[in-house]
Structure formats: structure tokens, C-alpha cells
């Protein structure tokens, strides 16, 4: 049976009197691929922020890699990698320099992870090319490399 990576039980997020997410329960299993779709303003981003521990739910329970406490979730976030729709990179930095900047910002130990991430997304030979000169597909793959830097679970 696949391991549960993330589970939510009736999580809700309120901003004042406005309810952004209302009573969502779900379970994400290891080895599966999931998508999150919905209309604008439906709460997708808020749900993702709660699922990745960036914000806490107003009510309900979040379990991430078996941890339910806020402190445990902070520790477990090191096992996550996320790809955003529009990654923000420095245009005049190389791919390698951009990843090095984010590696340091996140406190990820070891420079080998940069070469590993670039190889995994087939950008190993473009590490010295400036981000501004990348094609759209290459920019998206660099965003994926960023998500792989900390070698997520």
C-alpha cells in the first residue's frame, strides 16, 4: 500500500469574515499524480499554501509526512518541491547562478544538488547560459530544477 504523504481533514481558511477554503478533506498518496482545478477565486492557491505549510488552516487538521504539529510541518517542508506557474528568476544570472541563489536562501547544503537538478531536467549543458536567453520550455524546466534542489521525497 502506498504511503500517505499529505492528508487534510475538514480544513478551512478564513480571512476575516471571508471563507477562502471551506472544509476540504483529501489524501495524497506516494507515487500518484494529482491536479487541482477550479474557477478563479475558488481557493486553489490558499489550499496549496496550506498543503505546503506556508499558511496554517483556521480550522481542521493538516498532516504532512505523518506530522500534524506546526513545528513538525516546518521540519517536513524540507521534503517538498513545488513548481509554480511563473517562476521568478534573475534574467542576467545563469541557470547555475539562479539555482545557487535559491540554494543559499533555502539553506540547502551541498552544491552537488545544482548539477543533479540541472541534469534531471536535461539542462546540464546550459548551466552557464543566461536565463533571459532561455526558451519558454527551458524556463519551465529550470523551475522544475528549482523544485528538485532539496531532493524532495
Feature roles, as predicted:
Residues 60-70, 75-76:
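Conserved ABC transporter NBD signature motif
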Residues 52:
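Helix-to-loop junction immediately C-terminal to a conserved catalytic motif
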Residues 34-39:
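The feature captures the beta-strand-to-loop junction immediately N-terminal to the Walker
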Residues 100, 104, 111-126:
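Conserved ABC ATPase "signature" region
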Residues 144:
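Hydrophobic anchor residue at the start of the ABC signature
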Amino acid at each position: 500500500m502506498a504511503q500517505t504523504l499529505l492528508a487534510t481533514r475538514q480544513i478551512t481558511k478564513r480571512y476575516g469574515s471571508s471563507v477562502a477554503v471551506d472544509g476540504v478533506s483529501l489524501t495524497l498518496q506516494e507515487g500518484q499524480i494529482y491536479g487541482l482545478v477550479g474557477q478563479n477565486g475558488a481557493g486553489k492557491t490558499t489550499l496549496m499554501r496550506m498543503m505546503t505549510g506556508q499558511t496554517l488552516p483556521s480550522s481542521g487538521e493538516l498532516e504532512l509526512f505523518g506530522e500534524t504539529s506546526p513545528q513538525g510541518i516546518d521540519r517536513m517542508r524540507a521534503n517538498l518541491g513545488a513548481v509554480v506557474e511563473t517562476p521568478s528568476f534573475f534574467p542576467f544570472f545563469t541557470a547555475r547562478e539562479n539555482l545557487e541563489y535559491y540554494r543559499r536562501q533555502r539553506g540547502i547544503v551541498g552544491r552537488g544538488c545544482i548539477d543533479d537538478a540541472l541534469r534531471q531536467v536535461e539542462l546540464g549543458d546550459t548551466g552557464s547560459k543566461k536565463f533571459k536567453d532561455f526558451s519558454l520550455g527551458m524556463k519551465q524546466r529550470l523551475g522544475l530544477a528549482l523544485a528538485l534542489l532539496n531532493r524532495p521525497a
